[in-house]
Curated annotation (Swiss-Prot):
Residue ranges, compositional bias (Acidic residues): 214-236
Species per Swiss-Prot/TrEMBL record: Saccharomyces cerevisiae (strain ATCC 204508 / S288c) (Baker's yeast)
GO BP terms, alphabetized: positive regulation of transcription by RNA polymerase II; positive regulation of transcription initiation by RNA polymerase II; RNA polymerase II preinitiation complex assembly; transcription by RNA polymerase II; transcription initiation at RNA polymerase II promoter
Biased composition (Basic and acidic residues): 175-195
Classification via SUPFAM superfamilies: Transcription factor IIA (TFIIA), alpha-helical domain, Transcription factor IIA (TFIIA), beta-barrel domain
Gene3D superfamilies from the UniProt entry: 1.10.287.100, Transcription factor IIA (TFIIA), beta-barrel domain
Any Pfam family the entry gives: TFIIA
Entries under PANTHER family matching the protein: TRANSCRIPTION INITIATION FACTOR IIA SUBUNIT 1
Protein known as: Transcription initiation factor IIA large subunit
Region of interest (Disordered), ranges: 120-145, 167-195, 208-236
Family stated for the protein in its record: Belongs to the TFIIA subunit 1 family.
InterPro entries for this protein: TFIIA_asu/bsu, TFIIA_b-brl
Cellular localization per UniProt: Cytoplasm; Nucleus
Length: 286
């Protein structure tokens, strides 16, 4: 990928991100200037990486040149330093920028410290194009470095993070609410389907029972009340017979032999009561 194409990709990404977060900034009450400041900081960091040439490089380079010239004018205008005593010397060094080591003067100016100047790709020189190296008899040190320093206000970052968190929480609440509603609808739908199935099963059982009662397989002999075997003659304390009370699914007859499929019944055998869910019975009447 060529430098021009790479630069264009970076610029598209920066503009896209800024446009996407603009609405969030407005909702959070953050003005447009803050967004532009963050955009400029991002562009400045990209310029410092020197991965390619960007369209905004000149903007930051002009600002850095003005800062270097102002600092140079301030140092040259320091009281007690005779500018006519400066010696201009050309040196080939690997460091870019302006180097002002050991400015000495007879007046012993109490000035020392480090001055950080942000530079990118611009090399600051005097009018002759040479690096200034001045020596006098005083003790004043001024170190100029080319390391950039980017400061972002923590309160701006905190406000942005709070805005993003609020947006994410609102989205999560809406999603959870929608999921709960869908779950309730599914539960209600399942309950109705179960009720319909139970009704169909109950109706089928009723129809099956009615069909069995209407067939010839079940004769009047089962319903004959002439055999009052529930009443025991000569017994005052109750029946002494083996009794069974249950429902039947199917009854078939072959001559005098009966075969029954019984369910959900109670049976009394030798005066002991038992319950059962299903039973197969064969009986013969003589």
């Amino acid at each position: 990928m060529s430098n021009a194409e790479a630069s264009r990709v970076y610029e598209i990404i920066v503009e896209s991100v800024v446009n996407e977060v603009r609405e969030d900034f407005e909702n959070a009450g953050i003005d447009e200037q803050t967004l532009q400041d963050l955009k400029n900081i991002w562009q400045k960091k990209l310029t410092e990486t020197k991965v390619t040439t960007f369209s905004w490089d000149n903007q930051f380079n002009e600002g850095n040149i003005n800062g270097v010239q102002n600092d140079l004018n301030f140092n040259l205008a320091t009281p007690g330093v005779n500018s006519s005593e400066f010696n201009i010397k050309e040196e080939n060094t690997g460091n870019e920028g302006l180097i002002l080591p050991n400015i000495n003067s007879n007046n012993n100016i109490p000035h020392s410290g480090e001055t950080n100047i942000n530079t990118n790709t611009v090399e600051a020189t005097n009018n002759s194009g040479a690096t200034l190296n001045t020596n006098t008899s005083g003790n004043t040190n001024a170190d100029v470095t080319s390391q950039p320093k980017i400061e972002v206000k923590p309160e701006i970052e905190l406000t942005i993070n709070n805005a993003n968190i609020t947006t994410v929480e609102n989205i999560d609440d809406e999603s959870e609410k929608k999921d709960d509603e869908e779950k309730e609808e599914d539960v209600e739908k399942t309950r109705k389907e179960k009720e319909q199935i139970e009704q169909v099963k109950l109706q089928a059982k009723k129809e099956k029972r009615s069909a069995l009662l209407d067939t010839d397989e079940v004769g009047s002999e089962l319903d004959d009340s002439d055999d009052d075997y529930l009443i025991s003659e000569g017994e005052e304390d109750g029946p002494d017979e083996n009794l069974m009370l249950c429902l039947y699914d199917k009854v078939t007859r072959t001559k005098a032999r009966w075969k029954c499929s019984l369910k959900d019944g109670v049976v009394t055998i030798n005066r002991n009561d038992y319950t059962f869910q299903k039973a197969q019975v064969e009986a013969e009447w003589v």
